[in-house]
Amino acid sequence: MWMLLAAVLGSPAALESRQADQASLARIARGDHAAFAELYDRHARLVYSLALRILQHGADAEDIVQEVFAQVWAQAARYDPARGAVAAWMLTLTRSRAIDKLRAKRARPETAADASAAESVVDLAAAQDLELLSAEQVTRLQRGLKELPDAQRTALELAYYEGLTHVEVAARLAEPLGTVKTRIRQAVIKLREALAE
């Protein structure tokens, strides 16, 4: 849920956080270990939550966290703030790496116990992220989700909650890729509007 929230929220606090992240990344590019630790403290839980949501396996999610932060360290100097927020970049790295790992592991079936344990952790992480929002914002978001047309809500849920790529969503729904992308984009716009009310 938090990834969806990140896509629709644009508060002053979010702007301040983006600026702090950009400053940290500039320091990391100069080899500042303290800045790296600060960025890790701010985002490791978020990166882990997304990886766990996609992979449904704690150890694999931890591996992704390490890989993402190693990549952040190595590529900090190449980051371009004009292309988006640091957190969005890190979540994109996380999602890509987790989906790659998931595809590589698809041949190995998961046990019901593994899936159940992972769902519990994901539910807890989502609940903690919702605590960051006001009760009114949560209500608006939930109402906005319910008011989405079924086709938009389904495409959005598959992309954000199940970690599917747009191509995979299109295949699962037997819809053209362009249609799926439009539905997801329209759903995010409607949720932003619902939160702004």
Where do the protein language model's features map onto the residues?
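Arg/Lys-rich amphipathic alpha helix in sigma70-family domain 2
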Residues: A74-R78, T92-A113, S134
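Amphipathic, Lys/Arg- and hydrophobic-enriched alpha-helical face
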Residues: L9, Y40-G58, A74-Q75, L91, ...
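Structural recognition of an alpha-helix C-terminal capping motif at a helix-to-coil junction
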Residues: S49, D63-A70, G84-S96, T182
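Sigma70-family region 2
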Residues: A29-R30, R53-H57, E67-R83, A104-K105
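Intrinsic, short, N-terminal disordered tails of RNA polymerase sigma-factor systems
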Residues: M1-R30, E38, D114-T154, L158, ...
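Residues within the DNA-recognition helix of helix-turn-helix
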Residues: H43, I64, R183-K190
